[in-house]
From Swiss-Prot:
Name of the protein in question: Glutamate-1-semialdehyde 2,1-aminomutase
A molecular function GO annotation: pyridoxal phosphate binding
PROSITE patterns associated with the record: AA_TRANSFER_CLASS_3
PTM-bearing positions, type N6-(pyridoxal phosphate)lysine: 277
Gene: hemL
Keywords from the UniProt entry: Chlorophyll biosynthesis, Cytoplasm, Isomerase, Porphyrin biosynthesis, Pyridoxal phosphate
Length: 438
């Protein structure tokens, strides 16, 4: 059978288009987060109606195999029946207490048991909030102001982090954001990912001034970029030598590439860790944690102030507890890894069969590819990917019932709900789509 042409007429999205058209008069760009607007892939965004397991349905009734998973939280599959059941029971007791609840203890114990660096943890409501709070904490603990981040790494939309950031900033081609004072970013130093020499130079140029180094241990907001052997270990040594703290932003990798996150997978323990996504089971959540002596600086135990109305709310705690219980079941990560490895290998093979330059990889339940020759070791090399062709690919995959992240600079996610049949169908869809756009 000849490949289906990549045309809008092959997929009825009239209701999505009508809803999005109305949304543009109500919300900036018609969305609540920029990447959802399909700016980098073209066309109208798909408006979802419901999700279940590995699938999403739009308001026009089209069904997709979903590889975004709500941007990472849905590692057990959307609307897992055990998570839904636990939430139904919890919601009868109230949606938010604004007071301590025992569920916080339970989830905190699970996080501390799982994540090597975490001796104490504070729950917040988003990854951005976790990273913002962590930044204040490392400055308070060290008495220093400067930080080092890496080009293409995204740590939320707080002012200090919007310097050579990834995620939506990379998608829109913006180096930073209007409204961020130069005085705020003057203390943010940047280095290319996987470049230890640049980090050494920054420490040499800023003696006794750098509070910490923060990074995504696997970059998922500038595509999918893995640390080269020795990079994370080198950062651990450099921070210790210079009296700075090492922070892993595991909002994306936490509980996704292994139960203990990237730090357990790679065997490198930072001083502090930020988390989100998976630990809330699909509800808004964030967390930061680390060594007890550092965390005890957080109010009310210490002087560093941070608070939140909905932090530790019983619904997010309930969903997080049940999700981690499901992930602890024997064989969960073996299944996730095998599923993801088979998927990415099929994608790479399909691209090469079509004569396209392609490179990529996976770790645990996280994967990504670039439409360029590899390897891709940093954000500058990632920018060589063919974004125009990716836009065509994205549309072609929608036509074939597969929902990918609407950006060439975002990682993809699998779940326990993705079956062998889902993977087979997805690989065939890639074959057909690559053939259609090559």
């Amino acid at each position: 059978m000849a490949p289906v042409p990549v045309t809008a007429s092959n997929l009825n999205t009239s209701h999505s288009e009508a809803i999005f058209s109305a949304a543009k008069a109500l919300m900036p760009g018609g969305v609540s987060s920029p990447v959802r607007a399909f700016k980098s892939v073209g066309g109208q965004p798909i408006v979802f109606d419901r999700v279940k397991g590995p699938y999403a349905w739009d308001v026009d009734g089209n069904k997709y195999v979903d590889y975004i998973g709500s941007w990472g939280p849905a590692i057990c599959g959307h609307a897992h029946p055990e998570v839904i059941s636990a939430l139904q029971e919890a919601i009868e007791k109230g949606t938010s207490f604004g007071a301590p609840c025992a569920l916080e203890n339970t989830l905190a114990e699970m996080v501390i048991e799982a994540v090597p660096s975490v001796e104490m943890v504070r729950f917040v409501n988003s990854g951005t909030e976790a990273c913002m709070s962590m930044l204040r904490l490392i400055r308070a603990f060290t008495g220093r102001d400067k930080i080092i981040k890496f080009e293409g790494c995204y740590h939320g939309h707080a002012d200090m982090f919007l310097v050579k950031a990834g995620s939506g900033v990379a998608t829109l081609g913006l180096p930073d954001s209007p409204g961020v004072p130069r005085s705020t970013t003057a203390n943010t130093l940047t280095a290319p990912y996987n470049d230890l020499e640049s980090v050494k130079q920054l420490f040499a140029e800023n003696p006794d001034a750098i509070a910490g180094v923060i990074l995504e241990p696997i970059v998922g907001n500038a595509g999918f970029i893995q640390p080269e052997p020795g990079f994370l270990e080198g950062l651990r040594e450099l921070t210790k030598e210079n009296g700075a703290l090492l922070v892993f932003d595991e909002v994306m990798t936490g509980f996704r590439i292994s139960y203990g996150g990237a730090q357990a997978h790679f065997g490198v323990t930072p001083d502090l860790t930020t988390m989100g996504k998976v630990i809330g089971g699909g509800l808004p959540v964030g967390a930061y944690g680390g060594r007890k002596e550092i965390m005890e600086m957080v109010a009310p135990a210490g002087p560093m102030y941070q608070a939140g109305t909905l932090s530790g709310n019983p619904l997010a705690m309930t969903a997080g507890i049940k999700t981690l219980e499901l992930l602890k079941q024997p064989g969960s990560y073996e299944k996730l890894t095998a599923t993801t490895e088979r998927l990415i290998q099929g994608i790479l093979d399909a691209g090469r069969e079509a004569g396209l330059p392609i490179t990529g990889g996976s770790v645990g339940a996280m994967f990504g590819f670039f439409l360029c020759e590899g390897p891709v070791r940093n954000f500058e090399e990632a920018k060589a990917t063919d974004s125009v062709r990716f836009g065509l690919l994205h549309r072609a995959m929608l036509e074939r019932g597969v929902y990918l992240a609407p950006s060439a600079f975002e990682a993809g996610f699998t779940s326990l709900a993705h079956s062998d049949e889902n993977i087979d169908a997805t690989i065939q869809a890639f074959r057909d789509s690559f053939a259609a756009i090559s």
